């Protein structure tokens, strides 16, 4: 394949999987604003709804490693195509939910599909964009923000004029169209062979060196912070800053709008400069912004600080993936990224519990202050790595 042909193919595949990620994230993020309507319609409690969403997240996290490992041993396409199919089924099931049981099934099936898609699609981009890996992963990661912005608007219209089920069938149809486009463009073979999961080897490889262990700890702290902030930020604004629900939602949407720009930019800067250096800067900016937001109350200042917070922490997503992939062996990128992201998502899932407990028995200021400290620790860990790396180069 000529260089031009490779670049054209890589660009088309970037478009296909990035749009797929954006659409599935749009579908996933519809659940949060539609949850009150779902609870009322199905006659379930908030606790039950929370357990169902937790099941979705657990299934998604658990599927990360095997999907990455199998995509290494077979091909990326062998996992991506079934992932599209499972996602189509999962979102279509939401359209016909008639009770709690079907709601659980739809959530679990969709979580499996998302887990099957997440790592192989990222690994595919890493395969295709060796010199511009950060930029490609940044464009891909921005799909989360596209989905978040779209979900906020669609959910508002849905609860006013339609049933909560209405948006999910169009999501399934869009994913089906993207799957067809992906199959039409794909040049990888589809292969199913007898294989085993070497999770012990993958984990030992990831933690073999202190630098790798420290990187995992730093980004686990980052994901812990994200889980705590994202899930409670609108509630924090309404309960402590006297924001209306509408104003809190609008302020929260700023995070996604900023992320849409910052993620590709951070990835591109990481390709040209130092990924760790950019990550440290982002962590420090987010830590300062998270501390400042607890002591201000004027809406305009909160919007400014919220935007700065987003600038800081949104840089972390493409850089975390790229740093893990940079250090992974060429035949084990999917497995390494899958195992690392399983750890990150586990930390992410603990974040909301931490904020909820601390806010209940103390206050949000202490909870968010603790998250800011986590970011400072993460930045310190990465800064030490950078200093040691520089010293090593000088010693040579």
Regions found by a protein language model. Give the residues of each.
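Cytoplasmic helix-loop-helix junction between adjacent transmembrane helices
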Residues: 104-146
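Extracytoplasmic gate region of multi-pass secondary transporters
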Residues: 32, 211-253, 257-260
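Helix-breaking motifs and short loop linkers at transmembrane-helix boundaries and internal kinks
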Residues: 43, 75, 94-101, 113, ...
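Structural signature of the two symmetry-related core transmembrane helices
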Residues: 78-93, 277-292, 369
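Juxtamembrane intracellular "pre-TM" segments in multi-pass secondary transporters
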Residues: 1-7, 187-216
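Conserved MFS/SLC helix-loop-helix module at the cytosolic interface between two early adjacent transmembrane helices
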Residues: 62-100
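Helix-loop-helix hairpin linking two adjacent transmembrane segments in secondary transporters
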Residues: 131, 139-187
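C-terminal transmembrane helical hairpin of 12-TM major facilitator-type secondary transporters
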Residues: 273-323
């Amino acid at each position: 394949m000529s260089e031009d042909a490779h670049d054209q193919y890589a660009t088309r595949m970037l478009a296909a999987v990035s749009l797929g990620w954006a659409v599935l994230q749009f579908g996933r993020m519809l659940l949060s604003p539609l949850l009150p309507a779902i609870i009322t319609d199905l006659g379930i409690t908030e606790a039950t709804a929370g357990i169902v969403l937790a099941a979705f997240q657990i299934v998604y996290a658990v599927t990360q490693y095997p999907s990455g490992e199998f995509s290494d041993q077979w091909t990326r396409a062998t996992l991506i195509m079934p992932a599209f199919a499972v996602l189509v089924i999962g979102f279509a099931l939401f359209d016909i939910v008639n009770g709690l049981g079907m709601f659980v099934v739809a959530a679990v099936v969709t979580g499996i599909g998302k887990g099957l898609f997440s790592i192989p699609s990222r690994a595919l981009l890493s395969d295709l964009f060796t010199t511009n890996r950060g930029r490609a992963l940044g464009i891909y990661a921005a799909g989360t923000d596209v989905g978040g912005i779209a979900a906020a608007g669609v959910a508002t219209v849905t609860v006013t004029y339609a049933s909560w089920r209405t948006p999910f069938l169009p999501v399934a149809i869009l994913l089906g169209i993207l799957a067809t486009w992906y199959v039409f463009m794909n040049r990888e073979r589809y292969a199913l062979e007898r294989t085993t999961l070497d999770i012990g080897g993958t984990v030992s490889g990831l933690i073999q060196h202190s630098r790798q262990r420290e990187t995992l700890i730093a980004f686990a702290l980052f994901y812990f912070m994200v889980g705590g902030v994202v899930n409670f930020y609108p509630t924090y604004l309404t309960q402590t800053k006297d924001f209306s629900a509408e104003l809190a939602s609008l302020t929260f949407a700023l995070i996604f709008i900023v992320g849409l720009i910052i993620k590709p930019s951070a990835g591109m800067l990481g390709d040209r400069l130092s990924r760790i250096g950019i990550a440290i800067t982002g962590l420090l900016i987010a830590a300062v912004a998270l501390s400042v937001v607890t002591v201000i109350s004027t809406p305009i200042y909160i919007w400014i600080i919220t935007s700065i917070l987003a600038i800081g922490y949104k840089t972390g997503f493409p850089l975390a993936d790229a740093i893990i992939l940079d250090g992974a062996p060429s035949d084990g990128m999917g497995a390494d990224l899958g195992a690392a992201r399983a750890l990150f998502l586990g930390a992410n899932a603990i974040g909301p519990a931490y904020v909820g407990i601390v806010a209940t028995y103390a206050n949000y200021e202490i909870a968010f202050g603790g998250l800011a400290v986590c970011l400072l620790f993460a930045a310190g860990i990465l800064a030490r790595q950078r200093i040691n790396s520089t010293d090593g180069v000088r010693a040579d």
